[in-house]
Amino acid sequence: MRLLSLEVQNYRNICAARLEPGRELTVICGNNGQGKTNLLEAIWLLTGGKSFRGGKDAELVRRGEAFAVLEADTQRDRPEGCEPAEPAHIRMTVGTPEAAKPGRYAAVNGAAPKRAAALAGSFPAVVFDPGHLSLVKGAPEGRRKFLDAALCQLYPGYLASYRRYVRVLQQKNALLRHSATRQERPYAEKRTLLEVLNTELAAQGEALQQRRREYLTLLAPRACANYAELSHGAERMSIRYAAQFTPGGLADLLRQRQEEELRAGQSLCGIHREDLELLLDDQPARVYASQGQQRSVVLSLKMAEAAAAAQITGEHPVLLLDDVLSELDEGRKQYLLTCMKEKQTFVTSCDDTEFLKTDGEVYRMDGGVLNRV
C-alpha cells in the first residue's frame, strides 16, 4: 500500500498542508508541539479507525471551524511484473457537533459518502506512538483493543461480528443490572432472556476468539524474533493468550456462571475479559519491564503486526512511527531502519540532521505549516 499524496485542511493546528511522500521513507521534523503527530494522525484516519490518541472527533477540527477535510490518493501494491493498480481517491470530512454533517464521513472515487469506518481494510496501516507503551503496563482492555484493531483492518467480517458481540453484551448487562429506581423483571423472565442473549454471545465470542488465536500464531513468533534482535538476546520475549475458555467451551461457561452473574448484576465472562500476556524470561512484562524494555516490546509487536498483515493480505501496510527513534541506541535504530526497507514509512523526529542524507523525503513542520526541506 502507498500514500501518493495528502491534502489537509483545518485539522487540529494545521490550516492547510500538502504532503507528497517518498516511495519508502518520509520524515516529518520539527520541535515538539508543532503538529508532526497531527499529520501522522490524519494519515491514520484513512484506515477508517478512530484517532490513535483517543478523544472525540470534534477535537480533530481546527478551532473556529466546522469541518476538517482530508483528501488523499492511495495505491495498492501489485505483484512484480503486473500493471500498477489504479490510484484511489479518498475524501474525508470530520464535522463538529454543530456542523451540517457531524462526525467522520469518507467518499472513495467520488461515490456517496459513508461512515468512515466503512474504509476498514482499504488503506492498511500500522501506527506506533509513545502512548502505545501502555500496551505493556496498562490494563488488559488496551491489549484486546490492539488485537481487535488489527483484525478489523485484515478481515471485514471481524468488525461486524465484534459490533454484534458488543451490542449483545450491552443488552445483557442492562438486563443484569440491579436498580432501585426501576421495577425488576420477574426472575423466570430474566433468566429466559439471559439464556437467549448468552446463545448469541457464545456464537459471536467463539468466532472472535478463533480469529484472535489464528492471528497470534502469525504475530507471536515474529514479535519474539524482533525482540531478540532489538535486545541483542538479553531477554527472551514470549506471548500467551489468556483465554477464559477453550475453543467450543463458551456456551458451557456462560451456563455455569449464569446464576453468579444474576447475583452480581453484571457479565463475568467472555472474550471481553481475556488478555494478551507479554512475558520477558517468563515473567510478566507489565510488572518487571523497564522503560527501555517496554519500548522494545511494543516496537516488536508493531513490526510483527506489519509483517503479519503483509502475509495475510499480500501487501505491506503503511508504517506510521511517531518519535520512535529518539530513545534507541544506534544498533536498535539500524535494525528498525532495516525493517522499514521496501515499505512506505512515515517517521517524526525533533532532529532532522540524521535524515538530511536520506533517499526519502524530508519535511519540516512549524506551527502547523508544512514545508519540504
Residue ranges and their predicted role:
Residues 117-122, 129-199, 203:
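A conserved P-loop NTPase coupling/switch region
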Residues 36:
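Conserved lysine of the Walker
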Residues 48-142, 148-154, 158, 220, ...:
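Nucleotide-state sensing region of NTPase/ATPase domains
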